[in-house]
């Protein structure tokens, strides 16, 4: 079943009141943010989507696929759900090389494209300041390297059309580029975030409050331009962190580079 869009049918907030947002449809290639204070229900919304809820969760929301109730086997079998999740706390535990992991995952997904390993690693290295090599063992990858590899792997190999991202702002990767990469591969992307770089580069953001979808804000071109400028600062800070990590000194020249930019 090709998933072209999902629709969230509103349920109830923590007080049992109907959610102000009664329906929202998200199509492939769209990036939608989920914002709100701690305890506002962001993770529950993502969980409802991951479960393809049908009024059977605490929120009573329903999730439609292509405008229809998803088949029961899609709900019961995680493999048929085809939903990928990424979080800042995910790490690899398998004792194998990066190349072995990519080839194994590609084989399991029926992807036999030539140079698939190089393609995934090249994309991953666009997102991290620490280059990844195919002979690196997964267990020695840093947090930023792990998340970069996961994003590239989901984009290139995974056939999951829906990607749910839970607060990757502290994951040590180029966040702006990561979201653009996933959307460019035609994924439906929902991202929980407090980060202005991520929130402002989404097409829309769902504002959560008291367990309910309070409103939807369409991102303006002005906000997207602000996001690009903040992202430049963010990438500059990432480069400074990498210099510190590798034992290099910082100079006034490092500051002047940002000022000139």
Curated annotation (Swiss-Prot):
It comes from the Archaea. ATP binds at residues 36-43. This is Uncharacterized ABC transporter ATP-binding protein MJ0121. It holds the Pfam family ABC_tran. SMART domains: AAA. One of its GO terms (molecular function) is ATP binding. InterPro entries: AAA+_ATPase, ABC_transporter-like_ATP-bd, P-loop_NTPase. Residues 1-236 form the ABC transporter domain. Keywords: ATP-binding, Nucleotide-binding, Transport. PANTHER family: OSMOPROTECTANT IMPORT ATP-BINDING PROTEIN OSMV. Belongs to the ABC transporter superfamily. Coiled coil: none annotated.
């Amino acid at each position: 079943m090709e998933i072209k869009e999902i629709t969230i049918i509103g349920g109830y907030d923590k007080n049992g009141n109907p959610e102000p947002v009664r329906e929202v449809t998200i199509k492939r290639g769209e990036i939608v943010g989920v914002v709100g204070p701690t305890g506002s229900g962001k993770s529950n919304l993502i969980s409802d989507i991951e479960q393809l809820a049908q009024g059977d969760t605490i929120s009573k929301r329903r999730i439609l696929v292509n405008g229809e109730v998803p088949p029961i086997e899609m709900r019961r079998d995680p493999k048929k759900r085809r939903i990928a999740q990424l979080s800042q706390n995910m790490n690899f535990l398998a004792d194998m090389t990066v190349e072995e992991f990519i080839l194994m995952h590609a084989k399991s997904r029926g992807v036999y494209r030539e140079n698939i390993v190089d393609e995934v690693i090249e994309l991953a290295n666009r997102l991290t300041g620490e280059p990844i090599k195919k002979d690196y063992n997964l267990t020695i990858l840093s947090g930023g390297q792990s998340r970069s590899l996961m994003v590239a792997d989901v984009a290139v190999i995974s056939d999951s059309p829906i990607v749910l991202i839970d607060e990757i702002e502290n994951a040590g990767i180029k966040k702006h580029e990561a979201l653009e990469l996933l959307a460019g591969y035609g994924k439906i992307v929902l991202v929980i975030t407090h980060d202005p770089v991520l929130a402002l580069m989404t097409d829309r953001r769902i504002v959560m409050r008291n367990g309910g979808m309070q409103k939807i804000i369409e991102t303006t071109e002005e906000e997207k331009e602000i996001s690009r400028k903040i992202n430049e600062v963010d990438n500059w800070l990432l480069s400074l962190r990498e210099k510190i990590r590798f034992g290099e000194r910082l100079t006034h020249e490092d500051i002047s580079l940002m000022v000139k930019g």
